Amino acid sequence: MAWALKLPLADEVIESGLVQDFDASLSGIGQELGAGAYSMSDVLALPIFKQEESSLPSENENKILPFQYVLCTATSPAVKLHEETLTYLNQGQSYEIRMLDNRKMGELPELNGKLVKSIFRVVFHDRRLQYTEHQQLEGWRWNRPGDRILDIDIPMSVGIIDPRANPTQLNTVEFLWDPAKRTSVFIQVHCISTEFTMRKHGGEKGVPFRVQIDTFKENENGEYTEHLHSASCQIKVFKPKGADRKQKTDREKMEKRTPQEKEKYQPSYETTILTECSPWPEITYVSNAPSPGFNSSHNSFPIGEGNGSPNHQPEPPAPIVDVSAGLTPIQNLLPTSTPQEAQQWLHRNRFAAFSRLFTNFSGADLLKLTRDDVIQICGPADGIRLFNALKGRMVRPRLTIYVCQESQQLREQQQQHKHENGEAGNSAFYVYHAIYLEEMTAIELTEKIAQLFSISPHQINQIYKQGPTGIHVLISDEMIQNFQDESCFILDTMKAETNDSYHIILK
């Protein structure tokens, strides 16, 4: 038995209207969104969401940022919203970075009238390359001996004090500056982004770098170890004029995009503001031995999360031999020297900066290196110095003379031979001694002759040179400087007026 529910007329009208509304609401399912559809960015831009976002606690809301660093070159227009800015640089070109004092009145009063130290670094942006940074930089050093990754253009810079560049850290420079005075530093980046790509077949994209600045104030001991502020920005480095072409290409591509597509990208700014980041962790594999004219004091900082801050974990350092204990010092490196003895020899001869590179090298391994090998490994300056040290080469003296002491017996033999034959004889046997002069002065010659005679220099009254017709010419600095190299002289001694002194005659 079938039941049928009879609705009143008014209810039928209501039901019909609800069905039509429901059908209309389902009619859009499966169709593509039109231009007038809502986008998520529009939804998030509604006041209710903005108010909710502003109510969230900000980590840096009450944080004092004492400084601001501005790279005076335009950012790329091809960077999407909510992404970090990207700036293109030309290889070897000088770019200005302005160091601005961002403190409010009364903030950090301990900096008033004081200098601060800033350390500039060019580091990798990609996490993968950060883990192998040391190997990457050593490979670059091998291919570009004598070159640096980062330099300061000192003549163009303003307000920087005591700029320094450690020869073992090619990507780092540092200087002191006064926040109360105008300070602008011009930097040059000499490596290009494509030098660190995995495959180099042409047309590949270069890896991005970061320019990071860490600033420190002076502690109670006068060392700049107390961290104040760190900031960085993302860059790509091209061959000369390549950055200008890339900027122009990005700008032309953006001009061809529709207004809706352009809204997804941030505009190109005239300058690049470095954003706050965590301090760069100390690189532990760098030798603690200071280079000439470079203060190698090291700081250790915790690694934290920050905007654009690389979470860099340096590889553990290789053990360095303590040269002060356990081994008898060796003067010359021998083929039989062990790797430990080779490390000791490197430290004693001021090659500690390269000790890690030669950790497993024995004496034979080092001595087999050619001149080109050590120059490629250590650069031209240190490479030539290491090669000369390995080969035991001494510095050639400025002047070498040979002298022989004329004895009474030889003088009598010569006189007798002359009397018998009527001429000077050459049968006498003379033994000469070499005298090496560096300063080429009369005082230096006096000291060297005194050593030869095993007497005090004060016992030599005057030194003469026998001239034409047997005259005695007083030796002076100018005369010694005009001696021919490897000249030969016979030394004759004459008793001076005083009992304990002598006159020396060079014949």
UniProtKB/Swiss-Prot annotation:
Domain Grh/CP2 DB positions: 61-300
Broad class of where this protein is predominantly found: nucleus
Disordered, as annotated region: 240-268, 296-316
Domain of life of the organism encoding this protein: Eukaryota
Pfam families, per the entry: CP2, GRHL1_C, SAM_3
SUPFAM superfamilies: SAM/Pointed domain (SSF47769)
Protein name: Transcription factor CP2
Name of the coding gene: tfcp2
